């Protein structure tokens, strides 16, 4: 294969059979279970990179079921997302996500900079309870529960919240194994959102300590709200807003 062909066909690895296809990436009937809780403010600020700012010591613990996604297939994801501001405007910062499917794991890390690890999350309904769990190997590290569809939420308001920008710290190591080749803050949006439903109810969240899935490093001090959302949406491509290596 000549250099020109490599340059023109290169998208992702392996060159001749990429781990994921080009976008756009559309999600049908994407199901969110989000528990927002209050945590230790000093620990939280220590985990959020500047120039992002933390207005309140809050964390959104998410379980997300994606049964029908373009190119990525059928998978589930779980992790912690932090409400932040950037240049005075509200958004979110994804601290860590754990999922059970290779294409979105590879694509999420390589394209946007999603901090993804392989694990075993689940989101199910058992009779009258919405249940989210995260296992890292044989160890249960997160359990969330909520009363199933106790009260409807305003769809327009929930759509506005989903439309807020999400920020990611994208890090790609150099081939020397010692330094970062890429270290940048990226921003992406969920677009073309079609809301199917949104509900709330009484909720609980338990986090357990694990060396490699340290979700409990941001302890649960108080449950603030819980949301169950179903929507069709497209995960938009990203843009770089801050380059740490250029400073």
Curated annotation (Swiss-Prot):
InterPro entries linked to this entry: Acetoacetate_decarboxylase, Acetoacetate_decarboxylase_bac, ADC_dom_sf
MF GO annotations: acetoacetate decarboxylase activity
Catalytic residue positions: 116
Catalyses which reaction(s): acetoacetate + H(+) = acetone + CO2
Record-listed E.C. numbers: 4.1.1.4
Pfam families per UniProt: ADC (PF06314)
Role of this protein: Catalyzes the conversion of acetoacetate to acetone and carbon dioxide.
Entry-linked NCBIfam families: PRK02265.1 (NF002614)
Record-given protein name: Acetoacetate decarboxylase
Species of the source: Ralstonia pickettii (strain 12J)
Lineage, highest ranks first: Bacteria, Pseudomonadati, Pseudomonadota, Betaproteobacteria, Burkholderiales
